[in-house]
Amino acid sequence: PTITNDGVSIAKEIELEDPYEKIGAELVKEVAKKTDDVAGDGTTTATVLAQALVREGLRNVAAGANPLGLKRGIEKAVEKVTETLLKSAKEVETKDQIAATAAISAGDQSIGDLIAEAMDKVGNEGVITVEESNTFGLQLELTEGMRFDKG
């Protein structure tokens, strides 16, 4: 068995029989996947928020609320939250800040340090690929120019 706390990995494994529950599960899977595609992190938070929005939305509709009014309210709230987050966001600029941020995301300081080293070498416009290996330990490989693995 795989042990994980990653929202997108958990969401992918959800399979339900009830058609209505299945629709909700697919919605949560899509939220987790989009979050992973755009940000690469925060999938668990996005999954929990999506579940809360669905639960409370259905509760309000059952109590007589207008679904379109709820949708408009959620959209306004998203705008405000996005605005507030962008105001409080801080640039991650130094190698130490990059290492700390990467370590939190990876849950491992040595991986954070290696990612910071890779970022230092390739710059903000470079591409970093993380791959699993059959060997033990961490390794940084720098390829200048372009590399084609196949064909």
UniProtKB/Swiss-Prot annotation:
Pfam families cross-referenced by the UniProt entry: Cpn60_TCP1
List the GO cellular component terms: cytoplasm
Gene3D superfamilies annotated for this entry? GroEL-like equatorial domain, TCP-1-like chaperonin intermediate domain
Q: Which cysteines are joined by disulfide bonds?
A: none
Molecular function via GO:
ATP binding; ATP-dependent protein folding chaperone; isomerase activity
What EC number(s) are associated with this protein in UniProt?
Answer: 5.6.1.7
One of the protein's GO biological processes: protein refolding
Q: Please list the reactions this protein catalyses.
A: ATP + H2O + a folded polypeptide = ADP + phosphate + an unfolded polypeptide
Subcellular localization: Cytoplasm
Question: Which coarse location class describes where this protein primarily resides?
Answer: cytoplasm
Oligomer and partners = Forms a cylinder of 14 subunits composed of two heptameric rings stacked back-to-back. Interacts with the co-chaperonin GroES.
Similarity comment: Belongs to the chaperonin (HSP60) family.
User: Which protein are we looking at?
Assistant: Chaperonin GroEL
Species for this entry: Mycobacterium avium
Q: What is the lineage of its organism?
A: Bacteria, Bacillati, Actinomycetota, Actinomycetes, Mycobacteriales
